[in-house]
């Protein structure tokens, strides 16, 4: 709380803050949904869906029944050290305001009430210290299947040099600007090539290059070749499937491509079970490599 701001704006400071947050969220949604073509089933408002529906109060009541709460310096604390945390955490400040920790516990309850038995939390690289308390909240709220993903920083490489950024100084490149420069397909593909839990270098020059060095162009080129074969086959081929001699598919390139294609269902299943689209992206690159090898050494039509 900033006393000077409260005095200046009197009772309007909360409304002003909410209005600014609403505008900021709208700009983020535009980048994510319209510009980046990312679909969200639902957006949750912490104010409307968590606080105003009393999920923080319900979470607090559950914590109080756990016997792991205590008062200190006018604040309400939770014994997160019993869950491996390095220190206990404040739940409610001495001014009576709930902390992010309590709000996150409320999120668990709200998710559980909507019928979900699993919650995946995605944090930035500066939130390692938050893991133990979130795991504690999940356990107390009765959500047994809780996963935490710590994303890593992305370095932007331009002309072989790292573009220096600083959150403290407000120096950064927004994802929307990146999409505008390289295109949405390339931006999405480059990010999905890497696990969110590993560091990533985004090579701006490579992303804009239209050659086989660019993995996006490489995969798209294979797709165009596939389409060309299928189009010609539909126009010219009158051979019935039952008359095809599959024994002719016996070269190294034939066999490698067929083996890769046979893995498709397994790859989709693995990506779904691990919540990891990177597996599909890597597979598309491997499949493109095998297909291009096949295409360059075998006359198809």
Language model: regions and residue ranges:
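Non-catalytic interaction-recognition regions
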Residues: 1-301
């Amino acid at each position: 709380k900033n006393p000077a701001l409260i005095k200046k704006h009197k009772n309007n400071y909360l409304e002003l803050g909410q209005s600014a947050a609403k505008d900021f969220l709208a700009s983020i949604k535009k980048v994510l949904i319209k510009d980046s073509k990312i679909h969200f089933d639902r957006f949750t408002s912490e104010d409307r869906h968590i606080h105003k529906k009393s999920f923080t109060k319900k979470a607090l009541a559950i914590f109080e029944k756990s016997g792991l709460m205590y008062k200190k310096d006018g604040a309400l604390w939770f014994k997160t050290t019993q869950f491996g945390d390095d220190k206990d955490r404040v739940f409610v400040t001495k001014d009576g305001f709930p902390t992010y920790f309590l709000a996150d516990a409320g999120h668990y309850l709200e998710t559980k009430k909507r019928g979900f038995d699993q919650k995946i939390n995605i944090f930035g690289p500066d939130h390692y210290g938050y893991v133990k308390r979130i795991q504690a909240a999940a356990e107390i709220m009765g959500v047994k299947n809780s996963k935490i993903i710590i994303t890593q920083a992305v370095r932007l490489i331009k002309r072989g040099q790292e573009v220096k950024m600083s959150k403290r100084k407000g120096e950064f490149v927004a994802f929307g600007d990146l999409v505008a420069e390289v295109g949405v397909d390339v931006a999405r593909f480059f990010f999905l090539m890497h696990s969110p839990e590993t560091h990533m270098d985004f090579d701006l020059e490579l992303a804009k290059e239209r050659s086989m060095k660019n993995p996006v162009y490489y995969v798209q080129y294979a797709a165009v070749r596939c389409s060309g074969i299928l189009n010609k086959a539909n126009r010219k081929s009158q051979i019935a499937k039952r008359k095809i001699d599959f024994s002719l598919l016996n070269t190294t390139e034939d066999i490698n491509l067929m083996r890769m294609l046979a893995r498709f269902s397994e790859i989709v299943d693995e990506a779904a079970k691990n919540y990891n689209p990177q597996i599909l992206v890597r597979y598309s690159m491997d499949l493109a490599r095998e297909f291009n090898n096949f295409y360059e050494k075998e006359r198809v039509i």
